[in-house]
Regions:
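Alpha/beta enzyme core
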Residues: 1-253
Length: 253
């Protein structure tokens, strides 16, 4: 399986992130290419969010410095529909707007995409570990931060509540993000749901291992295995990680 993210062409960002829902977006084109080449041999998951496409870098419609939750939901639904139309097997909303799973599920069903699954970022924390990805995707907020809609790192009860809500709204899989500093959250959510549970071994976690290995401070293969085993032991059924290709090619797993 692969999880696809996209960025618009230079100068194409706008206040509402409209390039994200274009049928000719980078993500839609990548989905079509992968499906034409590999068909059902690969599960294609697509990220559904606005932050890489908005001129302000926030994950929703911004007005007077505040993200407007309900006005964002139709935009997220449109992104999911564009990805489903391109052939995505699963859409993965990462925005953390309230009610987005229900809005996306309703939109998919009404468009006859009942078989397209939803992997919900149920517990996405306002973490400093996202830094390298935000630099690469040029999605750092131009003003403020995302603490108003992403979760407080000190709060595990909210993760359980969000997992229950997303399951009730129609999510097929749930996710905890990041992974290594949140193994207790993975365990807590695992004990509350029978849905498949994913975790995201994010860019900062990956970069820390790579940087330490480059300096000879640790054995990369052993540490990668240990980290992935820890996530699995905590209860993750699926792991999204930047280590995957190298780990497979080098036989680390």
């Amino acid at each position: 399986a692969v999880l696809l993210f996209g960025t618009p062409e230079d100068g194409k960002k706008d206040e509402r992130g409209t390039p994200a829902s274009s049928p000719s977006s980078a993500v839609a084109r990548a989905v079509e290419a992968l499906k034409q080449r590999a068909g059902d041999e690969i599960v294609v998951i697509t990220d559904v969010c606005l932050c890489a496409y908005t001129s302000h870098g926030h994950c929703g419609v911004l007005r007077d410095g505040k993200v407007i939750n309900d006005e964002t939901l139709p935009l997220l639904k449109d992104i999911a529909l564009a990805h489903a139309g391109a052939g995505a097997d699963v859409v993965a909303p990462s925005d953390m707007m309230d009610g987005r799973v229900a809005a996306i599920r309703k939109g998919l069903d009404e468009a006859n995409y009942e078989d397209v699954g939803i992997l919900s970022y149920a517990a996405k924390y306002a973490s400093a570990y996202y830094g390298p990805f935000r630099d690469a995707a040029e999605s750092t907020p131009s003003t403020g931060d995302r603490k108003a809609y992403q979760m407080d790192p000190a709060n595990v009860r909210e993760a359980i509540r969000e997992a229950h809500l997303d399951e009730q709204e129609g999510a097929d899989m749930l996710m905890v993000k990041p992974a290594l500093a949140y193994l207790d959250v993975i365990r807590a959510v695992r004990q509350e749901t029978r849905l498949p549970l994913a975790t995201y071994n994010v860019s900062g976690e990956y970069s820390a291992v790579k940087a330490a290995a480059a300096r000879g401070w640790l054995d990369e293969a052993t540490v990668v295995r240990e980290n992935l085993v820890g996530m699995t032991r905590a209860g993750a059924d699926l792991i999204i990680t930047y280590h995957s290709r190298e780990a497979l090619e080098r036989g680390w797993l």
